[in-house]
Amino acid sequence: MTNIQYIKSQTQLPEKAIENTLSLLTEGCTIPFIARYRKDSTQNLDEVAIEHIAKSQADYDNICKRKETILSSIEEQGKLTDELRKRIENSFELNELEDLYLPYKKRRKTKADVAKENGLEPLAKQIMSQRVTDLELLAGRYLSDKVPTEKEALQGASDIIAEWINENTFIRRTLRRIFQRKAIISSEVAKGKNEEEEAQKYAQYFDWEEALNKAPSHRVLAMLRAEKEGFVKLKVQVDSEETLPFMEENIIKSRGEVADFLKKTVKDSYKRLLEPSISNETLQEAKDKADAKAISVFAENLSQLLLASPLGEKRILAIDPGYRTGCKVVCLDEKGDLLHHDVIYPHAPQNDMTMATKKLSSTVSQYNIQAISIGNGTASRETESFVRSIAFPKKVEVFVVSEAGASVYSASKIARDEFPDYDVTVRGAVSIGRRLADPLAELVKIDPKSIGVGQYQHDVNQSLLKEELDATVVRCVNKVGVNLNTASKSLLSYVSGIGEKMAENIVAYRSANGAFSKREDLKKVPRLGDKVYQQAVAFLRVHNSENPLDNSALHPEAYPIIKQMAKDTGISVAQLIGNKQAIATIDIQKYKTDKVGELYLKDVLKELEKPGLDPRTTAKAFAFDPNVKTFDDVRIGMILPGIVNNITAFGCFVDIGVKESGLVHISQLKDAYVSDVNEVVKLHQQVQVKVIEVDQIRKRISLTMII
């Protein structure tokens, strides 16, 4: 099987699209670049499909490397037959490869190995021929100092046969399929743990069982976590009536004494060798699927968070609320630069509301503040109420933003580099303000795992999680585009083709030489070659460039075509931009070439209509119910405004203005059946919910969605 055939079997994509995509990837093209500017080559594949191709190619390479290792190992042992080589070379399933390698794998000495050393393999072969009538008589021929009795000889032969059965690729493959279809996962409380307070969060798994292939991902991960923490014991089993008859049918071809002997051996092989092995495999496979689902949920949440509505270039006063240590206040200009910082003490124990009001009022006037951003942590509701009570001399919108990860950012190297002369409290408040202005630009500075929108994020495969989250950030950054003259090093590093080192070079060049006046100036950055320029330039915007196309998602390679389009239309390029009437008259067939296809040209016209359009909507102000500030204020039947602050596979959590977010279970999202929570709600969506349950002991709030 070629790599193209393998990838096609994994992705169900056309061979030509796969070939062209791999060719572009080999040339050093990035996934965002290929998805946006090489649609005609890939047959309009999106980033997810291209990532799938790249991953499948990596899987193919890993399988081929594993084959080489297996073949080399068996050959060194002098046991590689032509038939075995052919079976290994024709296999492209890792499980099957490992099954084929199992008899030749280096391992600890087994019962079967000892029996073979004692000369009992010929006895085992004779029994397996099933042409024997008297087992004890036959076993008597193999007695020795190490095997003094017929019983021990037969036991040794049984151990050898049990291992042969365990190494039978057909039996292993069939059992694997039976387990995949019919395995039951069960859990029971670990000895002495049922009374422990910490264990109570897993109480539902103290005596639990269900079909493994029906268990939702979050439940699989919850059970695995409970086992890891020592509170429960897990088992994955199939009724032996589903497995032993199949094995006996394939092994036993005789009757009488030999059949009875082999029946016991089959059972021993299954219980001692096969069941534990296949059970572990099946559970690992279930975990892998659960990991993939959890990672997918996390990535979708992160994407929604990164693409959250920005307020835009406004003057913002940001407040990081607090009680005893006060509320940290900073003022930011339109570019997010720090203008002023202070501390106010409107809450207990100081309760200095008069001075706090005076300071905020004068600061809003002095710095021409247009919006106030309040962190949603400790003392958030009280601070919001206090701010809204102030009669500012001009209209100022008030927003509450998530401060998850702000403390992580404030202590990070990035924050220290940005604000070397300020402490963590000022840096944290700046982050809260910048999140309102442009969530994407600020959140890329923080490890996504610190943002708090993941489901079982510490339980899943960490390398796969990082890979998917990094890919998500790259997708979001390149979807929006980046201002070349204001973007931070962190933001630039995610732009197609750039990376951390080149981002440093760009920022250093910008600091030394001033703002870029046009995209082409990017070529002056040290070590930024033609390939990086090709991959990156269209994702970078230069406002007020002498060429208006530099502030769009149009690639410079399209500029000559656009210039010709404008000329053929009888107007300038500047007049063509945004001119729907003129653009509608353009016949793209006139501009098609071997290298420029119809999909590319359609995208050019679409971008010309609305150049540089930000796919994000503008931020809207929101207010919680002023009468609900603590958990004790929440009552069953209340209808409350809220903001979706986390999405999981089993529902969504809604911030209703108290410390504890309420859960809207997937069954409470709407009247109809819901298979995917993301089809109904989005992260940070403003909603109305009704309280249906308040658990005072566990401090849990259950909600149902109204809108």
Residue ranges and their predicted role:
Residues 61-79, 89, 417-515, 534-561, ...:
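Long, highly charged, low-complexity intrinsically disordered interaction regions
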Residues 177-184, 319-323, 377-382, 401-408, ...:
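A glycine-rich phosphate-binding loop feature that marks nucleotide/adenosyl-phosphate handling sites
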Residues 1-19, 26:
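Generic start-of-chain signal for non-secretory N-termini
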Residues 542-707:
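Single-stranded RNA-binding regions, centering on S1/OB-family and related RNA-binding modules
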Residues 49-52, 59, 63-318, 324-422, ...:
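Duplex nucleic acid-engaging cores and interfaces of nucleic-acid transaction enzymes
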Residues 73, 87, 100, 226-239, ...:
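Structured, non-catalytic alpha/beta "coupling" segments that mediate domain-domain communication
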